[in-house]
Amino acid sequence: MSVAWIGSQPVSLMDAIQNVAKLLVSSRCPVFTIDADVHGTRSAIALAERVGGAFDHIHGDTLAREVALFADQGAMITTPGETRRRSSLVVLVGDIPVAHHELLLHLAGSNPDLGDRNKRVWFHVEGALEPPSDAGRLHRKLRPVAIGGEGLGLSGVLAALRADLLGRNQTGSLANVDRLKSALGKSRFPVFVFSGAMNSPDLAMLQGLVADLNKQGRASSLFLPTDDDAWGTALTSLWMTGFPPRTGFSDSLPSYDPVRWDTQRMVRDKEADLHVWVSARGTMPPKGRIGLVSLSRTEKRTEGAAVTISVGRAGVDHDGVAFSSRIGTFHSLTASAPSELPSIASVLQQLALVFPGRMGLPC
């Protein structure tokens, strides 16, 4: 089976790698769009630095919004383990992605055993204007008490709830707010669960509410990212460069700008002249009018790509390391169906070795 193509022609892996090296050497503004495990991400970032490019995640817009919470607002964050062991009051805020429902169901099947040992109770702060979610099974199991107000979106409900908890006068009332107040009075460590699907004003209001509660007791929030792999890329980027994705190396030093280094925008606006698409999940790149190199988990060439290299996925084709929101940190992955597909990290390491100077990547 072919794993590399130049245009539409199958070639050896080394021929494809050498062709990619030529394209990168001749490029004046290459950009990397990444979706990989930790090893693949580290190699892609190191290569972007080597060639003076910029990098972003495939889900860059969503990830940038999630990063903004921490960069612009700050947040009080706990882990799933601390929530499971210490919190008898869990408040869901907004819609929680289906990918995290199993984690919440696992929490529902246990009770805290440290500090706060009351039976765990659930509430759900939701807006009347939210689109229907896929939370039917989750709600049947958790049976959360709904907190909301007629005609209020999530922003309005959070604002009204925060004002109510501070004892401020307001027009209208929220359903079941007295029950939540009673539960807050009994709980020693309430936790508010939210995801990156919320918008920035909602996130800021939620963190303000948590900060208010911490003036008289202890409370925190549990962040469940929209995409675990994307959040892992953000954390990997932070420890390598000091910045999240949407970072560029145009003057050799890392520079973060969520607008300037939005790689897919740069491709659309032809600010870049070469797009290196790296996808272990096999996501196809959007069509563009600049040169394209595709490192993707695919069985055929990527349409429009000057070079296509088929790569494996960590946890399926080869071992790797990835972020898991279930444990709140990175964990190792064991290949479930080992194959001969090369890993992203190994391809990029070989690519670095055929560059002028033949220096391997420092990771």
Which residues are covered by each model-predicted region?
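N-terminal juxtadomain amphipathic helix
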Residues: 1-7
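Non-catalytic alpha/beta scaffold blocks inside enzyme catalytic domains
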Residues: 67-218, 248-363
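Short, surface-exposed alpha-helical recognition segments that flank or form part
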Residues: 8-11, 168
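Gly/Ser/Thr-rich loops at beta-strand to alpha-helix junctions
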Residues: 10-14, 19, 26-44, 95-99, ...
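Anionic-ligand anchoring segments at beta-strand to alpha-helix junctions in alpha/beta enzyme folds, i.e.
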Residues: 29-85, 214-253
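DNA replication sliding-clamp ring fold and its partner-interaction surfaces
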Residues: 23-27, 186-187
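Histidine-anchored nucleotide/phosphate-binding helix
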Residues: 19-23, 39-51, 111, 204-212
